[in-house]
């Protein structure tokens, strides 16, 4: 499991790639901390209601759940979350994996600049290395044979 500081740094980095303000990093991390793995869909998911938003807000030191709701909307607009029903959000596996987030032991980002810029994310789960490629589609996940060093 990644330390909380590493999770925050990772989230800040991927938000910066999509020009999402830094203030939403705490909301993304707080939401991810309360999310569970939906095995049927192969992604992390959270069901939010007023109580859950209040709890996330309280943990972040916010006075009301309003900023949490706004943050979820902003994260959805940027493609990090997908609202599948009212109050049900799925985390984009291209950024958060297709396995339980708690199993991630290490995560790396590689940014390539050129005629076509892209960003590759490598996550280490136990002995497995999984590469997530940024794509316009919500889900692009591939198993990688690359060494993680």
Predicted regions: what they are:
Residues 1, 125-149:
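N-terminal intrinsically disordered, low-complexity, charged/polar
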Residues 1-51:
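Short recognition helix of helix-turn-helix/winged-helix DNA-binding domains
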Residues 6, 111, 143-144:
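Intrinsic disorder/low-complexity segments enriched in polar/small residues
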Residues 9, 13, 42, 54-60, ...:
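Polar/charged alpha-helical tracts
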Residues 16-19, 61, 114, 126:
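Short, flexible coil/linker elements and helix-boundary hinge sites characteristic
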Residues 36-95:
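Winged helix-turn-helix DNA-binding recognition segment
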Residues 97-131:
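Short, amphipathic alpha-helical interaction segments positioned at domain boundaries
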């Amino acid at each position: 499991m990644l330390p909380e500081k590493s999770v925050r740094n990772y989230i800040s980095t991927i938000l910066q790639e999509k020009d999402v303000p830094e203030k939403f990093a705490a909301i993304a991390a707080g939401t991810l901390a309360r999310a569970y793995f939906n095995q049927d869909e192969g992604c992390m998911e959270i069901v939010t209601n007023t109580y859950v938003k209040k709890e996330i807000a309280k943990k972040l030191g916010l006075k009301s759940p309003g900023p949490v709701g706004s943050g979820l909307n902003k994260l959805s607009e940027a493609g990090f979350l997908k609202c599948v029903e009212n109050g049900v959000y799925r985390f984009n596996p291209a950024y958060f994996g297709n396995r339980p987030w708690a199993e991630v032991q290490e995560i790396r980002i590689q940014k390539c600049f050129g005629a076509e810029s892209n960003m590759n994310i490598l996550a280490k789960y136990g002995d497995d290395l999984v590469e997530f490629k940024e794509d316009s589609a919500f889900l692009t996940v591939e198993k990688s044979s690359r060494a993680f060093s």
